[in-house]
Amino acid sequence: MLPQDPSTEPTPADDAAPVDSAGQASAPSPADPEGVAHPRRIRSFVRRAGRTSTGQQRAIDEVGPRMMVPYAPQPLDWEATFGRKAPSILEIGFGMGETTAHIAGLRPQDNFLGCEVHEPGVGALLKLIDERGLANVRILQHDAVEVIAHMLTDDCLDGVHIYFPDPWHKKRHNKRRLVQPPLVKVLAARLKPGGYIHCATDWEEYAHQMLEVLSGEPLLENTSTAADGFAERPDYRPVTKFERRGVRLGHGVWDVVFRKRAA
């Protein structure tokens, strides 16, 4: 097991920065629903300049070779990747990985594939995987939209987690938001019948956009019976430190859970 070290917090993205400096793809455009990489695509994230700590780098070097999956534009062999056949959950943008590790620990029967471009976050989750002995998590350090388009096949996923994606709160930046109809259409195709998409955000206007976009996908149905359409927080999703702080300040958090209709 790797030695402990303080976690490095991610540096918030500068919302004035228009693109990811690495030039990776992001949310697919309506003209390109399969998310094929294109250098002029509007991006839903920027690469943050957070420092990778010594412990995180050690985890990348020592744990990464076992737990990281290289990007390749060909279908992922889930059974070979995880060494077993099990329900498959995709997490898009896991941040520093605490929620991913928590859920994976609660649900050892499921396989979790996390996509994250931020290197300190990758290192932080690899440390947690090592410290907690998690065998059911793999990491792809690549733009999730390209992974979904080129590595995932239809009817391969049992669930998708999208927690606290960048809200791009300035109106002129709303088009950069991850949860948009073209991406949801592809995710719905990748889900098995009965599979779910679970989104969470602390930005109310984005929460309503998520609800509207998911409601507009014919393959999906809302699991909530509440009048406003939002779901109670599922027991498996932990309340993060950031979330607790927001609640103390009077901020809300909204969960949206949709399921793919039976074939």
Curated annotation (Swiss-Prot):
Residue segments, region Interaction with RNA: 172-177
Catalyzed reactions per annotation: guanosine(46) in tRNA + S-adenosyl-L-methionine = N(7)-methylguanosine(46) in tRNA + S-adenosyl-L-homocysteine
UniProt keywords, alphabetically: Methyltransferase, S-adenosyl-L-methionine, Transferase, tRNA processing
Active site: 166
One term under GO cellular component: tRNA methyltransferase complex
Stretches for region Disordered: 1-38
SUPFAM superfamilies: S-adenosyl-L-methionine-dependent methyltransferases
Transmembrane segments: none
PROSITE patterns named in the record: SAM_MT_TRMB
Positions contributing to S-adenosyl-L-methionine binding: 91, 116, 143, 166
Compositionally biased tracts (Polar residues): 1-10
Binding site for substrate: 170, 202, 240-243
EC number: 2.1.1.33
GO MF term (any one): tRNA (guanine(46)-N7)-methyltransferase activity
Signal peptide: none
Superkingdom in the source lineage: Bacteria
Pathway connected to this protein: tRNA modification; N(7)-methylguanine-tRNA biosynthesis
UniProt KW Transferase keyword: yes
NCBIfam families cross-referenced by the UniProt entry: tRNA (guanosine(46)-N7)-methyltransferase TrmB
Family to which this protein belongs: Belongs to the class I-like SAM-binding methyltransferase superfamily. TrmB family.
Function: Catalyzes the formation of N(7)-methylguanine at position 46 (m7G46) in tRNA.
Protein name in UniProt: tRNA (guanine-N(7)-)-methyltransferase
Organism per entry: Cupriavidus necator (strain ATCC 17699 / DSM 428 / KCTC 22496 / NCIMB 10442 / H16 / Stanier 337)
Underlying gene: trmB
